[in-house]
Amino acid sequence: VLIIAVLFLTACQLIATASYARSERKHPDLRLSSRNSKLSKRCLGSGELCVRDTSCCSMSCTNNICF
């Protein structure tokens, strides 16, 4: 019984891995666009409107303006 359970779980993992790889091949543009959006984010320059310190290049957001 234990051997059958191990074989069943192994088969489930292989099926899940194969379907994940297939979906990545079907939609490579989605993967690239999400990767590019992460790379294209920039910090805000001095004088630009901000919400928090981490969005400013200087890490200083006072009264919603980067310094």
Swiss-Prot record:
One of its GO terms (molecular function) is ion channel inhibitor activity. It comes from the Eukaryota. Residues 18-40 form a propeptide. InterPro entries: Conotoxin. Expressed by the venom duct. GO terms for cellular component: extracellular region. Disulfide bonds join C43-C57, C50-C61, C56-C66. Keywords: Cleavage on pair of basic residues, Disulfide bond, Knottin, Secreted, Signal, Toxin. Pfam families: Conotoxin (PF02950). The keyword Isomerase does not apply. It is found in: Secreted. Residues 1-17 form the signal peptide. The presence of a 'disulfide through disulfide knot' structurally defines this protein as a knottin. Belongs to the conotoxin O1 superfamily. This is Conotoxin AbVIM.
